[in-house]
Amino acid sequence: MLNRLRALLSPLAHEQSLTLSGDAQSSLQRYMGYEPADVDMLRTHASVPARLSGDHCIDGFGVKTLYECVPFASPDSLDLARLQHPIPDDGFHAEGIEYVALLDSIERFSTEGSFVAVEAGAGWGPWLAMAGVVCRSRGVERIGLIGLEASRERFALMRRHLDFNLLDQQHGVAVDLFEGAVWSHDGVIHFPESALEDMGAAASTDSIDIDYRGHPVTTREVPCTRLPSLVGEGRKVDFLHIDVQGAEVEVISSHLTWLNQN
């Protein structure tokens, strides 16, 4: 594993990235992070023809996304080739390594018939939905999806997105959604009010009027939790995606023991 990481971070990584992606340019991909075998693995999973419908799109993994759930992306800007095979990225929100990481986790850890995914700073819950849809297509019997989102509006989009993909208790999926933020303690922190299409809002320990981007903001108190409190002590997590806009150091450093145990 260490040798693989060295290879992925080597000076040749950028050149290899262009080769693997057919010289496609990407504003989302910061570093490649994957190898040719990972691209092959991704393609084996992307067996559903990507297409655009009246109110939603379907990607190569079978995930259906309502346009209303991604208000920052215009349907006219979506690239079917990237929706089919998101290398070097999917063209609108995530780079290839994120897809590879989730698929690799599913292949490694769902073999005993269960899979638990956690998405913190989930937005509309794209990785929860993909985990659920892919696991269901593989016949995984016990699927657990745990999502955290501090924005009221985006929390509603996450629930809508999961329901639209039939990922709910009624369809045999254990879903636990927390309207709040992941943090270093259980309690409350501050989160800015922001436009629905602004995916860059970040929580803070104190009330602020200027955010990390220099934007004026008005914050409100929201619940916060440590992951062990929400997930449960001793419960196995197979995939964890954290996107908390710069608070990753605060969150991860306070969860090291729990992360190492998982």
What residue ranges belong to the model's regions?
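Phosphate/nucleotide-binding beta-alpha loop and adjacent structural elements of enzyme active sites
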Residues: 2-262
